[in-house]
Regions:
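Glycoside hydrolase catalytic-domain context in secreted enzymes
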Residues: 1-515, 522-529, 534, 579-1021
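Short beta-strand elements
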Residues: 536-579
């Protein structure tokens, strides 16, 4: 009997322990419920709408099935590459290929078989096999379009597949790639192109196979990736390979040998050599351009999942290329002024514990990209500013444009020819417009589209020199693309540009606020012209100035401004007087007279030095280290209302566009303080439910090439009884489709088509409705400051106006479908090196005229209701905490009134949540459940007790929640909701499991205890 009693006692202890664990599991699960639900695909609550006669679905899809949706995306992907591929060289009309030639294709280069179709990270290609829109690579596209391909070469390259594999460690996850990869931020570029010797060892007859397949297409690839970079010059190359490569974006000997092998084969077989550039970072290709044996060069970017269909159409002539370069293709990238300060420049007194790691001084001022090359060229022609000095020269001799630029910004060829005539230009400062009319005539033999690029050249005066205001010799003012024009036919294109894009920021000029910092227009002659790129445009202007250049002075219009103008743009469209907001971004503000910024007044004397091995001052260290965690008591906290019972829900404000409507204040008064603290502190992956106002969870998706985070069906509605027109059945074959399939943003930029950009916004909007995900961190509006940032594929261009035009078109079109499209990253995400903490320094003029101008239009013109900030610092201040940038420029000057998230920082101290909320950041990227315990585990000071002391903080919290819920109310997150919608708790299978375990272990504990006690009683008897 003793053994039985011991058994029951042991079982009682065991079951009681398990009961305790199962009881304790409940609160633990509740703390991580949101993350658990996302991982398991379960739901712990639901928005339930009572029966109603009103139309619950404000936003409607253009498609009645997922098949139609995917077909439209596939079609757009093909057309994006048809119009976004840039034909750079086409000697003797080598392209398009004849029908016979399409059957004789020899593909050379491992990127022909293993192409780069998206970024390695952040915007990687979604491979959607087994759906209604399978993605294709180059070979698959050629086969589908009926091309004949050299199978011997294909077998050779496929046999080397193992040699192409690269393993990349992405934060502990080992990713395998079978295409060329970009180096990590601390790495160098290593060529993967097989050598001639390697190819001979596999098949020594491979060259003979090109006798019958005598159209040799050589693909040269360079990948891009988030959290990666190319370093300028030889420092960025794996020297151990000994491949005579002087820059990671230049050719290696293996690539040269491959091109030369194709040229040699051409001499024997009478064929053609086409070089295809599969890249997003502008490469050094002057030797290819000047190689007489190369007949054609095509820049295809990263075509995404369907773009190779378009590339094939261009080769065959089914499509006529109409793309133009979004970047200058320099002879030597490392010689640009911006490249003098692109690298790993750590502080001598770095402190990694608070992310004080590195700096980058943008000493080139406004002169990045074509603004440098074309301005310096103009000054050499004009004989001013020591422009022909040797600094920055690729030859070591006097600087000469032809030695520095292979292909200019905006350049692109067609299979036909066009003639553009600038008929008129009207400048209307009162309405802030510049209106131009351009006649475009197809003077060739093939139908095609043309791009009209309107450029301006503004006065550079003694005032500018004295006040350190820089002026580009030419700048893109706006652009449009024609319809398809038949041979001999014409089209008149009207361009209406923003006149503010002619203005220059003058940090010393007085303004309406009585301080300094203003937009100015100098008195003098303003020139307007059109051309096939910036170089043709500047030559037209120089010709009009009676300079001896190859320009067309008859294609120039002028406008005279009699008096200096500092009033036309002194007040923003939002009614806010402008003033300096970014003076602390200038390193000279912290370390006096440290930086000499480049000026066209003296190219030689102001040429940038490399600012490295700097020691941050005590003031800088203090500013960078401050986490703003001290929440001081202030004001009258009781004056800020929380928890009111006003009987409203967010559905009452559905579609209300007036943010000053007093009902918003009534609704916000219902919020609890806990809800505000939780929502601002934990915003990663979704906005989460707010019960007091029945605000829905809005799922976030990432990736500039499409919704890359989740499959189409993961959050889709599968309940047809709801009346949702975008229900996806559980057995729908496209549930697992992922949208990361579009060509990279550089290709979208190369289309120079606002219409195609708008179609992409439409596609995103439709997909959002079907996927039930309302937020897309998708439009990259940073600039290609240099070709070396390995994240350039996520951004359109080196030019702000092109960035603004394409970005705004996408966002505006997406609005029609209720998707919240966020431009990112605000601002100056110019490098991935040390990106969490790097201090970016620049002048306010450069900041406003270059990168910020690209985002400004997305807010002012497209009314973006979402924005993402950056990892980096602006000067010494984390972007989240920079009041000048976020509160004063973004909100007050531009009128932004939407939700805003930090980037994926997840570092509590670096996030600086107190200042972030003050500046309008509505949520961090941290994740956790809807509990204060989850918040305080990250930010112990972000508590009800501390917040309750500060009227300022309470006011800021309610303001950010207004921004966030205003955005949601004007989005498709509200589809299916009405004022009758309420939240109902749901038991998931794991809730039922825990409940079952509690009951089971409870019963077993009681039973075992009873048996044990019964045994004791028998013993006593």
């Amino acid at each position: 009997m003793s053994r039985k009693r011991n058994l029951w006692r042991g079982l009682t202890t065991l079951t009681a322990s398990l009961l305790t664990v199962s009881v304790a599991a409940g609160p633990v699960v509740d703390s991580y419920r949101t993350d658990i639900d996302k991982f398991l695909g379960t739901k712990s609550s639901a928005m339930v709408t009572d029966s109603t006669d009103e139309d619950l679905y404000t936003y409607k899809s253009d498609y009645s099935s997922t098949t139609e949706l995917l077909d439209s995306i596939e079609d757009l992907g093909e057309r994006m590459s048809e119009e976004g591929t840039v034909l750079l060289k086409n000697e003797n009309n080598a392209l398009p290929l004849s029908k016979d030639e399409t059957q004789k294709l020899s593909l050379l280069g491992f990127s022909s078989y293993y192409p780069v179709q998206g970024g390695d990270m952040g915007s990687s290609l979604s491979v959607n096999k087994g759906t209604d829109a399978d993605t294709v690579d180059f070979v698959e596209a050629l086969n589908a379009k009926g091309f004949g391909i050299n199978e011997d070469l294909q077998k050779l390259y496929k046999s080397l597949e193992a040699d192409f594999k690269t393993e990349v460690n992405m934060w502990g996850n080992i990713m395998e790639y079978y295409h060329i990869t970009a180096p990590a931020t601390d790495g160098v570029f290593a060529s993967k192109e097989p050598s001639q010797e390697k190819m001979d060892s596999v098949d020594d007859k491979w060259k003979d196979s090109m006798d019958d397949y005598n159209v040799m297409l050589v693909t040269i690839g360079r990948s891009s990736t988030e959290n990666g970079t190319y370093l300028p010059g030889v420092d960025g190359v794996d020297a151990s390979q000994d491949l005579n490569q002087t820059d990671p974006l230049g050719l290696s000997d293996d690539e040269r040998d491959l091109i030369n092998a194709a040229v040699e084969a051409k001499e024997n077989n009478g064929g053609k050599v086409i070089v295809m550039l599969n890249n997003a970072n502008a490469m050094e290709i002057d030797e290819i351009k000047n190689n007489d044996g190369v007949d054609a060069i095509m820049e295809i970017g990263f075509p995404g999942g369907y773009g190779f269909y378009g590339v094939a159409d261009i080769l065959s002539g089914e499509a006529n290329p109409s793309g133009h370069l979004t970047d200058t293709y320099a002879v030597t990238n490392a010689n640009s002024p911006a490249a003098q300060n692109f690298g790993n420049y750590e502080w001598t007194n770095a402190d990694p514990s608070v992310n004080i790691n590195a700096e980058e001084v943008e000493a080139e001022d406004i002169y990045a990209g074509y603004k440098y090359y074309e301005t310096r060229y103009a000054d050499t022609v004009l004989g001013q500013g020591n422009a022909d000095a040797t600094v920055g020269s690729s030859t070591g001799k006097a600087w000469n444009y032809d030695d520095e630029v292979s292909y200019p910004f905006g350049y692109g060829l067609s299979y036909t020819t066009f003639e553009q005539t600038l008929k008129s230009v009207d400048v209307d400062l009162a309405n802030r417009t510049v209106t131009a009319e351009v006649d475009v005539k197809n003077t060739g033999d093939v139908a095609g589209k043309d791009v009209v690029q309107l450029y301006t050249s503004v006065p550079y005066t003694d005032y500018d020199v004295e006040n350190k205001v820089e002026k580009s010799a030419v700048q893109l003012l706006d652009y449009e693309k024609t319809d398809m024009i038949e041979p001999g036919e014409s089209q008149t294109v009207t361009i209406t540009a923003d006149a503010q894009d002619m203005a220059s920021w003058d940090s010393s000029c007085e303004n309406e606020a009585g301080t300094t910092g203003n937009w100015i227009l100098d008195n003098g002659t303003y020139y307007f012209t059109v051309g096939n790129g910036a170089h043709e445009a500047v030559n037209n202007v120089l010709a009009a100035q009676d300079q001896d250049v190859e320009g067309n002075k008859d294609n120039v219009q002028t406008w005279e401004l009699g008096d200096f103008d500092s009033s036309s743009f002194a007040v923003t469209l939002n009614g806010t007087p402008v003033e300096n907001q970014l003076q602390d971004a200038d390193l000279n503000n912290w370390m006096e007279d440290t930086v000499t910024y480049l000026s066209r007044n003296d190219w030689e004397g102001t040429w940038p030095e490399t600012y490295k091995d700097l020691t941050a001052t005590d003031e800088m260290i203090s500013t960078m280290a401050d986490d703003y965690s001290d929440i001081e008591a202030n004001g009258d906290p009781s004056s800020v209302t929380f928890g009111a019972d006003n009987g409203m829900t967010l559905a009452n404000m559905k579609g209300v566009e007036d943010i000053t409507d007093e009902r918003w204040s009534t609704l916000m008064d219902q919020l609890t303080l806990e809800e505000c603290l939780i929502r601002t502190g934990l915003g990663g992956t979704s906005t989460k439910v707010i019960e007091s106002i029945t605000s829905p969870e809005a799922i976030q998706n990432d990736g500039p090439n499409g919704f890359n985070s989740y499959p189409l069906g993961q959050y889709a509605n599968s309940d047809a009884s709801t009346g949702d027109p975008c229900v996806i059945a559980e057995d729908d074959p496209n549930r697992d489709y992922k949208m990361g399939v579009m060509a990279n943003e550089t290709v979208i930029g190369q289309t120079f088509s606002k219409q195609l950009a708008a179609e992409w916004g439409k596609a995103v909007g439709n997909y959002s409705l079907w996927a039930n995900t309302a937020i897309w961190w998708g439009v990259g509006t940073n600039l290609h400051r240099t070709p070396y940032n390995a994240r350039n594929h996520e951004y359109f261009s080196e030019d702000a106006v092109l960035t603004a035009g394409q970005g705004a078109a996408i966002i505006k079109a997406g609005h029609d479908y209720g998707v919240l499209i966020a431009p990112k990253h605000l601002a100056f995400n110019d490098t991935e090196i040390n990106r969490t903490g790097i201090a970016e320094f620049m002048t306010e003029q450069a900041a406003r005229e270059n990168e910020l101008r690209g985002t400004q239009s997305c807010i002012e013109d497209a009314n973006a209701l979402a924005v993402m900030t950056t990892y980096n610092r602006v000067g010494c201040v984390t972007s989240n905490a920079h009041t000048g940038l976020l509160l004063n420029i973004l909100h007050k000057e531009w009128g932004f009134k939407g939700l805003m998230s930090e980037d994926f920082i997840q570092d509590p101290a670096y996030t600086k949540i107190r200042m972030a909320v003050h500046n309008g950041v509505t949520m961090t990227c941290n994740t956790g459940d809807n509990t204060m315990a989850a918040v305080e585990a990250v930010w112990p000071y972000w508590s009800v007790e501390n917040a309750s002391q500060s009227e300022e903080l309470l006011t800021d919290l309610k303001q950010t929640m207004l921004y966030q819920n205003y955005a949601l109310a004007n989005s498709n997150a509200m589809d299916g909701m009405s004022t009758s919608t309420h939240i109902e708790k749901l038991n998931t299978w794991y809730d039922n499991l825990i409940t079952g375990l509690r009951i089971g272990f409870g019963v077993l504990t009681v039973l075992c205890a009873a048996m044990y006690l019964l045994g004791l009683k028998k013993k006593e008897q």
